[in-house]
Amino acid sequence: MPAHFQRARNEEQRAVRRQAILDTAAAMLTDMPVAEVSLNALSRRVCLAKSNVLRYFESREEILLELLDAESRAWLDHLARELPTAVGADAPPATRGDGLAAVLARSLATRPVLCDLISAQAAVLERNVSPAVALTYKRAALANAEVLAGLVRGCVPELDERGALRLAGAVFLTAGSVWTHAHPSSAVRAAYEADPALAEMRLDFTETLQEVLEVFAAGLLARRRVD
């Protein structure tokens, strides 16, 4: 049991119990995809009744949105340490844009939990929450996008603030989409194996994401030069 008391009787104990629920859900995501993390299974793992879990979070989706924010912030902290030395400051803008795309794609590929959560965000996680929870999450998501935009401008200062924020938004949007297509169902994988002509439809996550981000960054830089 994650806490030694049976009932949270004050704010400190409530915070401990709430964090225990989040930590348990995070541990589950290392063993299974987002789609398999149910509220019932989480309740059993955290040794609480389902009704008690719902005292701390209004739904499974709220829990997972909080984890998505936490995973995003952890990734951004890592990027802030990696990017300054990973992208050559003296290279031409286009080369730095390509280098940035490569670092972002490789970095996200090492964080499957984050990518899985991003892929479920709009279609699943935002569908069973109250306006208050949605507002909290969207504010956090915007803050994370602004942090990423700042890191983007550190590598490619030729982009203005709006362009950097657009690229940051594209990173999150594209990562979720590419992750889903790069991890198809067993039936689709079997179809790929059965027909070699479908080989071109099989996507490698890192390679595909890098290529898309390279094109997006190049387009923003080209538009900036024209403007």
Task: State where each predicted segment sits.
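Alpha-helical structural segments
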Residues: 16, 20-27, 62-85, 106, ...
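C-terminal peripheral helix-coil segments that are non-catalytic and often amphipathic
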Residues: 142-158, 177-227
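Helix-turn-helix
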Residues: 28, 35-62, 66
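Basic, helix-initiating cap at the start of DNA-binding domains
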Residues: 1-33, 40-44, 87-92
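Membrane-interface starts of transmembrane alpha-helices
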Residues: 156, 160-168
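Hydrophobic alpha-helical connector segments
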Residues: 66, 80-114, 136, 167-171
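Helical hydrophobic small-molecule/effector-binding pocket
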Residues: 98-129, 181-183
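Amphipathic alpha-helical interaction segments
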Residues: 20, 41, 99-103, 166-173, ...
